């Protein structure tokens, strides 16, 4: 090989190296800017400002996918509160975290002939036949976390599905890991393959971590949410043996994984802060807020505005009853860390934006 050819190859390699470094610097800058935006106070109400006045004498049944899940019960509280304001009767049925339980709850709700049913936290495809039965009976069906995307679901027919876009949630969690580690995160992603929204969120987080050339995606670990707390000690011990110090960041689709992980981390001598950074891309449970506030094995969570989403579900039902289209409202993603944990309802261990959303919905409904 001639000296000229060698020089050209070295020059090309150098250019590639410089280009890769520039791309990595750009990613870090973007990630850090995104984190700043996602942790900012939420003071502006960017939801709907017009809509139909309140329909009179209506009833709504909230089917809780699992009465032990903090996110599901938080939305239920919002639906109940908003139903009281708009003047409707409210009832809740617990699906008890199983497919059979969801089926039983759906059947009971349909038999009661309410004006509307809220599918609260389980996949619409799982109960397609019963949702279709409700629609044919003239019952409005809306949902929270019944599919991977917000907005109407065509099959089975759901007027609208309320959820924070998974792309936004995944981006906030993954970018926090990239920014906080300065591009050196070794990541395990925890998800539940039984739910489409969980898998979509996990895959989106994994794809973003892969764009960080100096980060490492160690594994996407499947563990059902329903059995996460008793299973996670053994799962955690196994992962620590497998990866050791290479595992320094966790991205989970729900805080509940960290509820079960803490005992194993403590027993293994893992420091509560700085050694294994745990980030949840969803839920914002009370225990997660407490861990973040106390610096105990969790750095961040991405809570949804559960009470606000409950109010939105009631508003969406009211739009459906009036023959109008869904509002297609979705609040921007919000990242909670120790630095901002006491803002926007965080002092009460929840994300409740201080943007007067209750007053805005009352104005729309004439209440």
Segment roles from a protein language model:
Residues 18, 23-367:
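A residue-level marker of the well-folded mature domains of exported/periplasmic proteins
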């Amino acid at each position: 090989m001639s000296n000229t050819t060698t020089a050209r190859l070295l020059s090309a390699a150098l250019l590639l190296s410089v280009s890769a470094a520039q791309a990595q610097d750009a990613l870090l800058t973007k990630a850090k800017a995104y984190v700043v935006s996602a942790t900012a106070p939420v003071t502006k109400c960017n939801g709907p400002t017009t809509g139909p006045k309140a329909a009179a004498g209506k009833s709504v049944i909230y089917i809780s996918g699992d009465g032990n899940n903090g996110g599901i019960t938080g939305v239920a509280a919002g639906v109940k509160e908003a139903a009281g304001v708009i003047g409707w009767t409210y009832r809740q049925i617990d699906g008890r975290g199983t497919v059979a339980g969801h089926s039983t709850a759906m059947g009971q709700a349909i038999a009661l002939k309410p004006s509307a049913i809220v599918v609260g936290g389980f996949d619409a495809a799982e109960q397609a036949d019963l949702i279709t039965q409700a629609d044919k009976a003239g019952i409005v069906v809306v949902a929270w976390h019944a599919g991977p995307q917000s907005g109407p679901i065509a099959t089975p027919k759901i007027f609208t599905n309320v959820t924070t876009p998974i792309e936004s949630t995944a981006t906030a969690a993954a970018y926090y890991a990239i920014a906080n580690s300065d591009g050196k995160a070794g990541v395990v992603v925890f998800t539940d393959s039984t739910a489409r929204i969980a898998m979509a969120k996990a895959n989106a987080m994994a794809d973003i971590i892969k764009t960080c050339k100096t980060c490492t995606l160690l594994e996407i670990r499947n563990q059902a949410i329903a059995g996460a707390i008793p299973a996670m000690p053994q799962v955690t011990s196994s992962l620590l043996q497998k990866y050791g110090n290479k595992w320094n960041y966790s991205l989970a689709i729900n805080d509940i994984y960290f509820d079960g992980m803490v005992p194993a981390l403590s027993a293994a001598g893992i420091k509560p802060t700085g050694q294994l950074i745990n980030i949840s891309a969803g839920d914002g449970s009370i225990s997660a807020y407490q861990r973040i506030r106390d610096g105990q094995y969790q750095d961040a969570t991405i809570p949804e505005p559960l009470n606000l989403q409950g109010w939105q579900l009631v508003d969406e039902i009211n739009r459906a009853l009036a023959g109008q289209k869904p509002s297609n409202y979705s609040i921007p993603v919000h990242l909670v860390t120790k630095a901002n944990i006491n803002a926007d309802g965080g002092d009460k261990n929840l994300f409740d934006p201080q943007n007067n959303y209750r007053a805005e919905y009352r104005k729309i409904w004439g209440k």
